[in-house]
Regions:
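Active-site regions of metal-assisted phosphoester/phosphodiester hydrolases
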Residues: 1-210
């Protein structure tokens, strides 16, 4: 709709339409609910859980009300006359948060305006087979690391890619993927025994980095 110049005035209604249209992602066999059903018992048992991947959906922690007012225009070449930035409480990331999984990048960089952390998609020349022109792309952070664990702490997180101006870590050679990579450093503040048996708190240690 936006590419055709159909810019809605009621953004709350647009958000509802987007969530309805994308609801199948969460319910699908490779979607969020399948993941949550597998990790929820581990989380409830107090286990350390780290989940990472290409989620094929943005995060509600990026599409915030603040970003809607002051954030970047996500459309590479916007021809609509209105910035592509509005609030959307994306259902998948909301569901992960509700089950107790935190976003490593947003834990390290809570300001979604200064640090958008986009992983989709690095620039590429027009005419590549199977890819639309780059100026049609919408930039977003769809590759993420989520974690939980009372003894797990984020020390650092980064996007890895082709340009230091965009990424915390720049690759020295050609970047051939259509996604940027993500990495995080964690500290386990408990003992090795807690890592294998999180309900046993008898031993203490200064912490281990992973």
């Amino acid at each position: 709709r936006l590419k055709k110049g159909d810019v809605p005035k009621d953004l709350d209604r647009l958000e509802a339409q987007i969530l309805k249209t994308t609801s199948g992602i969460a319910r699908g066999p490779r979607g969020y609910l399948s993941l949550i059903n597998r990790v929820k018992p581990l989380i409830q048992a107090g286990e350390v859980v780290v989940v990472t991947g290409d989620f094929n959906e943005p995060s509600h922690q990026d599409w915030t009300q603040a970003a809607a007012k002051r954030g970047m225009d996500r459309w590479v070449k916007n021809t609509s006359g209105r910035p592509l930035r509005f609030k959307v409480a994306w259902a998948g990331s909301v569901a992960l948060e509700k089950v107790g999984l935190s976003d490593a990048y947003r834990t390290r960089f809570p300001d979604e305006i200064k640090k958008p952390g986009n992983t989709w998609t690095p620039p590429y020349p027009d005419g590549l087979p199977g890819r639309q022109p780059y100026h049609h792309q919408v930039l977003d952070r769809i590759d993420r690391i989520h974690f939980t664990g009372v003894h797990l702490r984020v020390l650092d997180a980064a996007v890895v890619g082709e340009d230091k101006r965009i990424c915390e870590i720049a690759h020295s050679g050609p970047w051939v993927s259509d996604h940027r990579a993500v990495v995080a450093t964690f500290e386990f503040t408990g003992s090795a025994e807690k890592l294998s048996n999180p309900k046993n708190d008898r031993n203490k240690s200064k912490g281990t980095k992973y």
